[in-house]
Amino acid sequence: MQQTRTEAVAGAFSRCLGFCGMRLGLLLLARHWCIAGVFPQKFDGDSAYVGMSDGNPELLSTSQTYNGQSENNEDYEIPPITPPNLPEPSLLHLGDHEASYHSLCHGLTPNGLLPAYSYQAMDLPAIMVSNMLAQDSHLLSGQLPTIQEMVHSEVAAYDSGRPGPLLGRPAMLASHMSALSQSQLISQMGIRSSIAHSSPSPPGSKSATPSPSSSTQEEESEVHFKISGEKRPSADPGKKAKNPKKKKKKDPNEPQKPVSAYALFFRDTQAAIKGQNPSATFGDVSKIVASMWDSLGEEQKQSSPDQGETKSTQANPPAKMLPPKQPMYAMPGLASFLTPSDLQAFRSGASPASLARTLGSKSLLPGLSASPPPPPSFPLSPTLHQQLSLPPHAQGALLSPPVSMSPAPQPPVLPTPMALQVQLAMSPSPPGPQDFPHISEFPSSSGSCSPGPSNPTSSGDWDSSYPSGECGISTCSLLPRDKSLYLT
């Protein structure tokens, strides 16, 4: 039983070996038949391809045309297929010149890099030839100037316009082809010449398909730039430089857009509230301003836009008539105009109740009676201010001309109720002996103005601009309205 099993296994193994051997033999035979029989390694001098027509006569030659099986298909004749490096059948009479062209490849052998036989006889693709040139291109770096001179001289001699047919001069054709071969070598090494390179096909022949060497020159130049790390010059560097856009300058004489009455009222009032209470939030300030705006009458609300337009025209006087926002000279503070005794009497002379009595006869806002009054940071109308708080002799002295407390040449444009509200919002600092409030809360914006004695000690030039020397406000940092300051 065991012997029978062993014989069966041996028989199966032998059959397997025989089958595998038969297949291997068939493969070897087919390979030998393919190499030696159908595709013989025969290189034809007139063809750049293996002579397939010799081993298999059934294949069509390159000069034959294929006619359809039916006689009705005469319109569908396929044109002859021309290899890249072969001329068309109509140009086969130039074969002698082709032979001279094939011999040109022998001429240029720098440093023994190129073989002594032509590219056509080797049947090497143009890519392989260009790779061979690229690998050994560093050996040609020393001869680049010489090659360039040869190219320029040969092409100049070729383009000189000599009489006679081009194909009838083998020497001229040879020199032109050698120049083109040299220029092709230069282009393989990444050097761009100003000469337009043509494909190394005969000048008189026309190829149905583009030459592989002309199509691979650009690819090899790209590879050279990648390997050598050189940067390809940009096509047009002038396009990259973009002119920066110039910002349009704002015309100072351009009229401003009209501002709403509530915006002007909110701007002036919230500045005064923030000056007194820096820790107040924006919401609290907005509520206070809204309550003050609601308490105003319709006529007062409508008069605010007209005043806003007047103020916008004041903000844009001619350039030579602009008064300075800040005094161009340093003014001493309040303490320099008052003696220590006068200053002490001014600080402790009266109680804050005098301010309440002064404003009690006016229609005051109920929402601001209990809030802490902040100092105003915007100009007030001096006439209204003096009529509210100054004695009669001081009012008569200041009514002509009125002192402008704003940088604009015209008087301030705040309405009467707004001036009253600011009086309520002022700090309860004790007024002076003449029962008018302290107005030094805004010395930086409109100058230092201080109450002084009946005979103040100040500059005579300043006192001459007022009609009386007994003015309550003896010195101010700004000039009267009729003496506007001109900028130089």
Curated annotation (Swiss-Prot):
SUPFAM superfamilies attached to this UniProt entry: HMG-box
Keyword terms, alphabetized: DNA-binding, Nucleus, Transcription, Transcription regulation
Biased composition (Polar residues): 302-316
GO molecular function: chromatin DNA binding; transcription coactivator activity
Motif Nuclear localization signal boundaries: 223-252
Localization of this protein: Nucleus
DNA-binding segment(s): 255-323
UniProt record, GO biological process: positive regulation of transcription by RNA polymerase II; regulation of transcription by RNA polymerase II
Gene3D superfamilies: High mobility group box domain
Biased composition (Basic residues): 240-250
Any one GO CC term of the record: nucleoplasm
Main location: nucleus
Domain of life the protein comes from: Eukaryota
Region of interest (Required for transcriptional activation), ranges: 76-114
Region (Disordered): 192-258, 293-328, 363-473
InterPro entries recorded: HMG_box_dom (IPR009071), HMG_box_dom_sf (IPR036910), TOX_HMG-box_domain (IPR051365)
Compositional bias ranges of the Low complexity kind: 204-216, 443-460
Ranges of Basic and acidic residues composition bias in the record: 222-239
Functional description taken from the UniProt entry: Putative transcriptional activator involved in the hypothalamo-pituitary-gonadal system.
Name of the protein described by the UniProt record: TOX high mobility group box family member 2
Gene from which the chain derives: TOX2
